Structures are given as C-alpha cells and as structure tokens.
Amino acid sequence: RSCIDTIPKSRCTAFQCKHSMKYRLSFCRKTCGTC
C-alpha cells in the first residue's frame, strides 16, 4: 500500500483515529505520512 498524507501530523492523534477517521491507530499514522 502506498502511504498518502491525508491530514496534518499535528492532527494525527489517537482521538482523531478512533473518533474521526474510524481507522486503527497504525493506519492513521500511515495516512499522516509516517511510513
């Protein structure tokens, strides 16, 4: 899978992942460009 930076790293928090993005934390980290 390619990693796409969909949200700013500053907003990549556990809360964002669990409540806004509906993804697991590991996937949220990938979408924040930390792959």
Curated annotation (Swiss-Prot):
Organism: Stichodactyla helianthus
Keyword Disulfide bond: yes
SUPFAM superfamilies found in the cross-reference section: Crisp domain-like
Site (Key residue for binding both Kv1.2/KCNA2 and Kv1.3/KCNA3 (occludes the channel pore like a cork in a bottle)): K22
Marked site (Important residue for binding Kv1.3/KCNA3) residue numbers: I7, K9, R11, S20, M21, Y23, F27
PROSITE patterns for this protein: SHKT (PS51670)
Miscellaneous comment as given in the Swiss-Prot or TrEMBL entry: Negative results: does not show or very weak activity on Kv1.5/KCNA5, Kv3.1/KCNC1, and Kv3.4/KCNC4 (IC(50)>100 nM). The synthetic analog ShK-192 has a paraphosphono-Phe (Ppa) at position 0, a Norleucine at position 21, and is amidated. It is stable at acidic pH values and high temperatures. The circulating half-life of the synthetic mutant is estimated to be about 30 minutes in rats. However, low concentrations of functionally active peptide are detected in the blood 72 hours after the injection.
Result of altering I7Q: 10-fold decrease in potency of inhibition of Kv1.3/KCNA3
Cell compartments where the protein resides: Secreted; Nematocyst
Impact reported for F27 to Q/R: More than 25-fold decrease in potency of inhibition of Kv1.3/KCNA3
Protein name, entry field: Kappa-stichotoxin-She3a
Function: Peptide with both antimicrobial and neurotoxin activities. Inhibits voltage-dependent potassium channels. Potently blocks Kv1.1/KCNA1 (IC(50)=6.7-87 pM) and Kv1.3/KCNA3 (IC(50)=10-250 pM). Less potently blocks Kv1.4/KCNA4 (IC(50)=0.31 nM), and Kv1.6/KCNA6 (IC(50)=0.16 nM). Shows moderate activity on Kv1.2/KCNA2 (IC(50)=9 nM), Kv1.7/KCNA7 (IC(50)=11.5 nM), and KCa3.1/KCNN4 (Kd=0.03-30 nM). Blocks Kv channels by binding to a shallow vestibule at the outer entrance to the ion conduction pathway and occluding the entrance to the pore.
InterPro entries: ShKT_dom
ShKT domain location: 3-35
Gene Ontology terms: biological process: defense response to bacterium
Upper classification of the organism: Eukaryota, Metazoa, Cnidaria, Anthozoa, Hexacorallia
